[in-house]
Amino acid sequence: HGQSEESIGTNSADQYFAFARDCAFVDATGHQANDFQVTNGFWSDLDRLAVKFEEADKFVVLPGYEWSGNTGMGGDRNVYYATEDRQIRRSSHALIEDKSDLDTDCNTAAELFEALADNKEWDVVCFAHCGGRYADVKMAHDGRFEKSMEVHSSWGTFEWLVQDAFEMGYRVGIVANSDGHKGRPGASYPGASLFGAVGGLTCLLTDELTREAIMDCLRKRRHYATTGGLGGRMVIDVTARFDGDATLYHDDPKIGPAEGRSATEAMMGDIVHFPDGSAEIDVDVLCPEPIERIDIFNGLDLVETIRPYTQDELGNRIRVVWEGAEYRGR
């Protein structure tokens, strides 16, 4: 996702979708304009463009917007819909002259989730996002809608966001996106102001390329994130096998009624209750560039680091690496 000239960016929304499909060669994208800049006319235009560019089995467009409340109100959230012609619930009308639908505003992230629930919009999927106003998931989160944390974009890398979620016991997926403002979704590069990183990509594990399948994938957290660029289209397959019977869920049973089924195997994104026995996890990683290391975490705890080389193969060169956010935010 990203933005275009109608909100805060360059090139039109029409050119934005064309770039994603024809230049970045991504399979799916969404447009996430700051809500306080989205007029009702532009909201209708985005619906029209979603219909124009949507083509089953070739290119999927997810209607949506960025709920753009300040961090003190909950911070940025990406909101995606399964259909067009939906009610946009803005954080404010700050830059919109037409105030006729001011009563639909949700001034906090908690109010947004409450409004979605009150109106039974269970098909909506939200991501916690770090853009102009980083998300505070400890202040507001609703697992019925907010399925994932965005850990990388053109703004930088934000592993602390998913760490916050794990500290709170949330069961969430991980995504990465462009969020550039130059109209280049899927191929966003540094070069403007605070956008100092290559935009990220998300691999979506689905059987078919349709909007329904993509939304189902997002709800079930069957995806993973990369930091984009030349090595950003790696293939990762994760399978867990149990030596006893387990109960598998797609929805978190801790936050409400959830249908479970018996299983001896699980895939990426599944929630599993496994009271006894042991589990074996198989991970396959295919990468277009050499792999430096694979870190395996259990929540916040680093369990093991795997390096595909031996000490003798290192040679006599020293590599100096530094990483991590300079400060909480972007």
Where are these regions (language model features)?
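Extended, charged catalytic domains and RNA/DNA-binding interfaces, predominantly
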Residues: 1-330
